[in-house]
Amino acid sequence: MNFEHISREDNEIYALIEKELERQQNGIELIASENVASEAVMEAMGSYLTNKYAEGYPGKRYYGGCYVVDGVEEIARERAKELFGAEHANVQPHSGSQANMAVYFTILEHGDTVLGMDLSHGGHLTHGSPVNFSGKLFNFVSYGVDKDTEEINYDVVRELAIKHKPKLIVAGASAYSRIIDFKKFREICDEIGAYLMVDMAHIAGLVAAELHPSPVPYADFVTSTTHKTLRGPRGGLILCKEKYAKDLDKNIFPGMQGGPLMHIIAAKAVCFKEALDPSFKEYMARVVENCKELGEQLVKRGFKLVSNGTDNHLILVDLNNKDITGKDAEKLLDEVGITLNKNTVPNETRSPFVTSGVRIGTAAITTRGFERRDMEEIADIINETIINRDKDLEQYKQRVEALCEKYPLYK
């Protein structure tokens, strides 16, 4: 990218931008919620569209001069609908959390009961955590994973639904490595007369590539981010049935947000177009292939995977048998250039600031070009770094850099 002007006008920030590029280039990015956006997406984010205020929706703005950005938003909405087979799309949410909030405000009243996945079992803050707005404004009841299989037990979900009679059931997760059966969730919702919202932020790319069953035919509302497996800009997306469109849209604007970020909406449109290309399906297939292989290689080295494997882009590693916490593993591996995040595991005994596990994803490294054969080396570096954590780690840092040199970023 061309940084001619910022390098001249603000060298302090420019230096940090270059430093971050160096960090990304020389490190292996395994955070499951991160990816590498294309230069086309980034060009849209840095475009002249950032100058335009456009409160409202296409054809009904509160500012003049919106006829160009109206076209941008229309394209983004139509591409999102085409990509996921949805009746309606709202591309204005600034984040996934705001997308979830908008759905809640569309169909819930303060204090209504909602059934969502427990954060410590793989859910998300906005699925009812008591420290989040969702847990403060609504009466969330949590479901988790089975103690033995570490997968969702739909019979237990049904029992909880019948007992608590939630107005809404939230399906979806931030750290769950198995296929989610949206049809079963729909059946449970129909049995008790509840709405179904699916948060597919993590698996949106897999859904687009038809590598995970789509929630769209079953859910009343589907929310997502656009920057994880979709490889787009940081932002949110909501899909819904047409009958909810009007109420949903007014809960985004004027309910929660003012002016939409038109440069980000343009970048969303670009990423939707990229995801509609046949090459995107090939990319997502490689993401899953790499994740499965990395998981298998870690198991060979004595690591315990939650649910014993993966069906998607991430694995959750239980470190209880490795005599190291998630917090310490995250810090240790960062020292050699491998970035991942500490994560709670089912039946967690440690605090969320320490944790007994780590979450690993392969979306970003697959975008860079990492192949299945590289997963053995990554697993080996992770294992040996943890084993030899009290020794000099320079050799592992060099091995990471050698791998990264094979797959340059933005070159």
UniProtKB/Swiss-Prot annotation:
Annotated site residues (Plays an important role in substrate specificity) in this chain: 227
Top-level class of the enzyme under EC nomenclature: transferase
Compartment(s) where it occurs, according to its Swiss-Prot or TrEMBL record: Cytoplasm
Gene Ontology MF terms in the entry: glycine hydroxymethyltransferase activity; pyridoxal phosphate binding
Alphabetically ordered keywords of this record: Amino-acid biosynthesis, Cytoplasm, One-carbon metabolism, Pyridoxal phosphate, Transferase
GO cellular component: cytosol
Subunit note: Homodimer.
Family indicated by similarity: Belongs to the SHMT family.
Name by which UniProt lists this protein: Serine hydroxymethyltransferase
Organism: Clostridium botulinum (strain Eklund 17B / Type B)
